[in-house]
Every structure is written in structure tokens, then in C-alpha cells.
């Protein structure tokens, strides 16, 4: 493992090409971050963001800037879990800023966040939607390396999400988990579960009733609500794979 002395930066800008394909217009990244060339899946380009390191360490900082051009359709994925190692008396951080232009679509679906014992991680995401922009955002948080007996042994995990629609704040979620100060397995928090999925959807093409029916048929502990034109889905389970499969089965 190595801790990069400078802030790691990744910038990505996409556009709709003359042939109708979704292409990368601009990109820039510094170690250990990289961008894999897009794969076209029907009319959506799937782009993988990767990190060629074993995970985040103390004082590591990632700055991610994504710009989805007008009418382009992009699915962003990652190649591995976001591993947060022991940060000692400090913390690791990540800030993501996403702009989605008019009539563009983004499915943002990174693999789960995995905080190791004694780790601290601060994650902030700001998303700006233009007129008729569509967003499918998901985040999965693990209690730790459960198979190794590390269950809520991290020091702190905070995740702040702000979504703006035509420059008006329409969604704000602020989660701050401190296991030493909180009863994480209280019925009001994780209860008996170790993995949590959070999905936020702003998409006028999605019918809430159809989603509700799919959720009713799920074996997971899952709920759905609406707010300010958005759809919020929360799910709990003891395996990240089942949460990932649940999202896939929604077939959004």
C-alpha cells in the first residue's frame, strides 16, 4: 500500500457524438485514479473508474469531478470496493461533484464502501441537475470486514449528499456513523443487519407504482418514499451481493 502525498484528482466530461454515441470529451486523472474507455451498452456508455491502490489511508484525499454532457447517457461504475484502511488519528476523504446537463442521464453505481477497523472516512457528493436531466444514484455501506469479525469497528463514517435541480436544493442527506458513541445495531439504525443500500432517483420516466410492486416482491428489508420529485429507496441486508443484485433486479 502507498499513500499519495498529493490530492488524487479525476476529471471526466462526456458528450453525445455526431454518430449518436456517448463519448468522453475530456478526461484527466492523477495516481492512483484512472478511467477505462467506455463500453457502449445499447444507447448507454458504461465507464469504469478505477484506483490502482489497495485502498485509502490516513490523509488520502480524492477529488472527483464528473460532467455529463447534454443528451449523453452514462453509467459510472467502479472496479472494486472502496476500502478504507486504519487511518490512525486522522481520516481519509473523498469529494465528488457531478453536473448533468439538459436531457442527459447518469446511473452512478460504485461498489460498496468498506471501512476497516479503526478507519475514519468523510465522503461528500454534490450533484447538479439541469432541466430534464435524469439521475440514478446509489451507495452501499458495509459494517466492515464482516467475515473477519469486524462489525462496526471503524471509528467514523460520514456521507453527505446534496442534489440540486436547476440550482435549487431538492435533496439533502447527512449520515454520520460513530460506533463508539452510537448503538449501531439498535432497531432504529442497522438492527440485525450489516449492509445498507441508499438509492436516490430523479427520473420522470420512472413510475413509482411499478417500483413499489417490485419492492413488495423482494425478500430484503426495503422501503420506498418520494420527496421533491425524487424517489428514495433504502434497503438493509447482511450481504452486499444481495443488495447489488436487488438494484440490478429493479431494471431501471
From Swiss-Prot:
GO terms for cellular component: cytoplasm. It comes from the Bacteria. It holds the Pfam family UreD. UreH, UreF and UreG form a complex that acts as a GTP-hydrolysis-dependent molecular chaperone, activating the urease apoprotein by helping to assemble the nickel containing metallocenter of UreC. The UreE protein probably delivers the nickel. Required for maturation of urease via the functional incorporation of the urease nickel metallocenter. Belongs to the UreD family. This is Urease accessory protein UreH. It comes from Helicobacter hepaticus (strain ATCC 51449 / 3B1).
Amino acid at each position: 500500500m502507498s499513500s499519495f502525498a498529493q490530492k488524487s484528482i479525476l476529471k471526466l466530461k462526456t458528450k453525445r457524438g455526431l454518430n449518436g454515441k456517448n463519448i468522453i470529451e475530456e478526461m484527466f486523472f492523477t495516481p492512483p485514479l484512472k478511467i477505462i474507455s467506455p463500453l457502449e451498452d445499447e444507447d448507454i456508455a458504461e465507464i469504469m473508474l478505477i484506483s490502482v491502490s489497495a485502498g485509502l489511508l490516513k490523509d488520502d484525499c480524492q477529488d472527483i469531478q464528473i460532467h455529463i454532457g447534454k443528451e449523453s447517457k452514462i453509467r459510472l461504475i467502479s472496479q472494486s470496493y472502496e476500502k478504507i484502511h486504519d487511518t490512525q488519528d486522522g481520516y481519509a476523504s473523498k469529494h465528488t461533484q457531478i453536473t448533468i446537463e439538459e436531457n442527459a442521464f447518469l446511473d452512478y453505481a460504485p461498489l460498496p464502501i468498506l471501512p476497516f477497523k479503526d478507519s475514519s472516512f468523510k465522503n461528500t457528493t454534490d450533484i447538479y441537475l439541469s432541466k430534464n436531466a435524469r439521475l440514478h444514484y446509489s451507495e452501499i455501506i458495509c459494517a466492515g470486514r464482516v467475515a473477519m469479525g469486524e462489525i462496526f469497528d471503524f471509528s467514523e463514517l460520514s456521507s453527505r449528499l446534496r442534489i440540486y435541480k436547476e440550482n435549487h436544493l431538492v435533496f439533502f442527506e447527512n449520515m454520520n456513523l460513530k460506533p463508539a458513541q452510537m448503538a449501531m445495531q439498535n432497531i432504529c439504525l442497522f438492527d440485525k443487519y450489516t449492509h445498507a443500500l441508499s438509492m436516490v432517483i430523479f427520473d420522470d420516466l420512472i413510475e413509482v407504482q411499478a417500483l413499489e410492486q417490485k419492492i413488495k416482491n423482494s425478500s430484503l428489508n426495503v422501503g420506498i418514499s418520494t420527496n421533491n420529485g425524487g424517489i428514495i429507496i433504502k434497503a438493509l441486508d447482511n450481504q452486499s451481493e444481495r443488495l447489488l443484485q436487488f438494484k440490478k433486479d429493479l431494471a431501471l
